[in-house]
C-alpha cells in the first residue's frame, strides 16, 4: 500500500505551526507495514487542494488528509474531498449527538451552522469518532483509493489514529525494526563497507543514521510475527557484522549495543552493576561530564564512588597528589598526566577502575597540541592503559561529548575482556 499524507492549513505553509502530525502518522503507519511515499502541505484553498487530490489519486492507494475539519469558513477539507469524489456530505448521528451534548452543557455558547459541519462526513465514509474533540473523521474507498480525513490538532488526531484508523488499516504483516549502534567508525566508512548490502536491499532493509560521535543502523522487515521478523533480521545483522573495515577489523568490534535508547554510558553502568565493580574519575577538559553522565542513571551509588574535577595544573597536583614538577615536565595534555590522573583517582577512592580525561577542547590549542587532542587513561588491577584520540573539526561541546564517549567505550572494552 502506497500512502500519501496531505496536511491542509495555511498556518503550516507560513511557519506558524510545525507539522508534527506527518511525523507521527509516518511512524505509526510504518509500524503496521504501510509505506508512506509522499508528504505534502497545502493551504486552505479549494482549487489547490482539488489539484493535489487529483495527483494523489493517481499515485497513491491511501490518501490521508489532516486538518481543515473545524467550524470556520476556511475549514474546507471534507467539502473539497466530497466535491472531488462527486459525493455529498451527510451527518453522522453519533457526531451530531456529541454536538448536542456539548452545547447543552454550555448554554452560554452560541451554536452556529458552521458548528454543524463538524458532524458531517463524506457520503459512504466510515466515521472515525473523535474522542477529544467535536470534528468527526472518516475513511472512504473510491476506485481503489482509500481516503482518510483526520482533525488537525494533535490531541485529537493521535487518539483517532491509534484507536480508530490503525485497526482498520491493519494487514497481515507489520514492520519490525532492530537498531544496531556503532562507535569508533564514521558513517561514510560504514556506508562504503556496506555498499553492496545497501544498494541491493529489498527486504529486510537497512538505513544508516549519523549522530554525534556514533552511527546507528536501522534494520527493518515486514513480517507476520516477531519470530518471523527475527529470522530475517538475524541473517542481515550477521551479514553486516561479518564485514570488515579497510584495516581488516570486524564490524563486531565497533557494534556496542542495540535499541533507540541504548548508549555507551548505559551499557557501562549496567555491566559495572552486573560485575559488582566500582569506578572513579578524574577529569580536566570534560569538567565532570563523565561523572555527570554516570549520575544520570539510578542506583549508581553502588558502582560510582566519586571523582575529581582538576581543571588546572595546580589542582591536579593538589587534589591528586601528582608532583607539580612532573606535570610541568610532561604537560597537562599528555600520556603521563592521563596515566597518573587515572591511577590516583582509582587509588584515592579504592575503586576497581579509575578513568581520566585530559586534552584540548578548544577553541585555542594548548601546549602545542591542536584542538581535539585528548588523552584518556584507564587504571585497573592489570595496569593502566592510555589512549590518544583526535577529535578535530568539532565544536568545543562536541569535543567534550565525544571524549566522554571514548572514555565509556574504553571502560566497556575492559569490562568485556574480564
From Swiss-Prot:
Pfam families named among the record's database cross-references: CinA, CinA_KH, MoCF_biosynth
InterPro entries attached to this UniProt entry: CinA, CinA-like_C, CinA_C, CinA_KH, Competence-induced_CinA, MoaB/Mog-like_dom_sf, MoaB/Mog_dom
Inducers of expression: By competence and damage.
SUPFAM superfamilies on file: CinA-like (SSF142433), Molybdenum cofactor biosynthesis proteins (SSF53218)
Domain of life: Bacteria
CDD domains linked: cinA (cd00885)
Annotated S-S bridges: none
PANTHER family for the chain: NICOTINAMIDE-NUCLEOTIDE AMIDOHYDROLASE PNCC, NMN AMIDOHYDROLASE-LIKE PROTEIN YFAY
Protein family: Belongs to the CinA family.
Name assigned to this protein: Putative competence-damage inducible protein
Organism for this UniProt entry: Streptococcus pneumoniae serotype 4 (strain ATCC BAA-334 / TIGR4)
Lineage, broadest ranks: Bacteria, Bacillati, Bacillota, Bacilli, Lactobacillales
Gene: cinA
Amino acid at each position: 500500500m502506497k500512502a500519501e499524507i496531505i496536511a491542509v492549513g495555511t498556518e503550516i505553509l507560513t511557519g506558524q505551526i510545525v507539522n508534527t502530525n506527518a511525523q507521527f502518522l509516518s511512524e505509526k503507519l510504518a509500524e503496521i507495514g504501510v509505506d508512506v511515499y509522499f508528504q505534502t502541505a497545502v493551504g486552505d484553498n479549494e482549487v489547490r487542494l482539488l489539484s493535489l487530490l487529483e495527483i494523489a489519486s493517481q499515485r497513491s492507494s491511501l490518501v490521508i488528509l489532516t486538518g481543515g475539519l473545524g467550524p470556520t469558513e476556511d475549514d474546507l477539507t471534507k467539502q473539497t474531498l466530497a466535491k472531488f469524489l462527486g459525493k455529498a456530505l451527510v451527518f453522522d448521528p453519533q457526531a451530531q449527538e456529541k454536538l448536542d451534548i456539548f452545547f447543552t452543557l454550555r448554554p452560554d455558547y452560541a451554536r452556529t451552522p458552521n458548528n454543524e459541519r463538524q458532524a458531517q462526513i463524506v457520503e459512504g465514509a466510515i466515521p472515525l469518532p473523535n474522542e477529544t474533540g467535536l470534528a468527526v473523521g472518516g475513511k472512504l474507498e473510491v476506485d481503489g483509493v482509500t481516503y482518510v480525513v483526520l482533525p488537525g490538532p494533535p490531541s485529537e488526531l493521535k487518539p483517532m489514529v491509534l484507536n480508530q484508523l490503525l485497526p482498520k488499516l491493519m494487514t497481515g504483516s507489520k514492520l519490525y525494526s532492530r537498531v544496531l549502534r556503532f562507535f569508533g567508525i564514521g558513517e561514510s566508512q560504514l556506508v562504503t563497507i556496506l555498499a553492496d548490502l545497501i544498494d541491493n536491499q529489498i527486504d529486510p532493509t537497512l538505513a544508516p543514521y549519523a549522530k554525534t560521535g556514533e552511527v546507528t543502523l536501522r534494520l527493518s522487515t515486514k513480517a507476520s510475527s516477531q519470530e518471523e521478523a527475527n529470522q530475517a533480521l538475524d541473517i542481515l545483522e550477521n551479514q553486516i557484522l561479518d564485514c570488515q573495515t579497510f584495516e581488516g577489523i570486524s564490524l563486531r568490534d565497533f557494534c556496542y549495543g542495540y535499541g533507540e535508547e541504548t548508549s555507551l554510558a548505559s551499557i557501562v553502568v549496567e555491566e559495572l552493576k552486573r560485575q559488582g565493580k566500582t569506578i572513579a574519575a578524574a577529569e580536566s577538559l570534560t569538567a565532570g561530564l563523565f561523572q555527570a553522565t554516570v549520575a544520570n542513571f539510578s542506583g549508581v551509588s553502588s558502582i560510582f564512588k566519586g571523582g575529581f574535577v582538576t581543571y588546572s595544573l595546580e589542582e591536579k597536583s593538589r587534589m591528586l597528589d601528582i608532583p607539580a614538577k612532573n606535570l610541568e615536565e610532561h604537560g597537562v595534555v599528555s600520556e603521563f598526566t592521563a596515566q597518573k590522573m587515572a591511577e590516583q583517582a582509582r587509588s584515592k577512592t579504592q575503586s576497581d577502575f579509575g578513568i581520566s580525561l585530559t586534552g584540548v577542547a578548544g577553541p585555542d590549542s594548548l601546549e602545542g597540541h591542536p584542538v581535539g587532542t585528548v588523552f584518556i587513561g584507564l587504571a585497573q588491577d592489570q595496569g593502566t592503559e592510555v589512549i590518544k584520540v583526535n577529535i578535530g573539526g568539532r565544536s568545543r561541546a562536541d569535543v567534550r561529548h565525544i571524549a566522554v564517549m571514548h572514555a565509556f567505550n574504553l571502560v566497556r572494552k575492559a569490562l568485556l575482556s574480564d
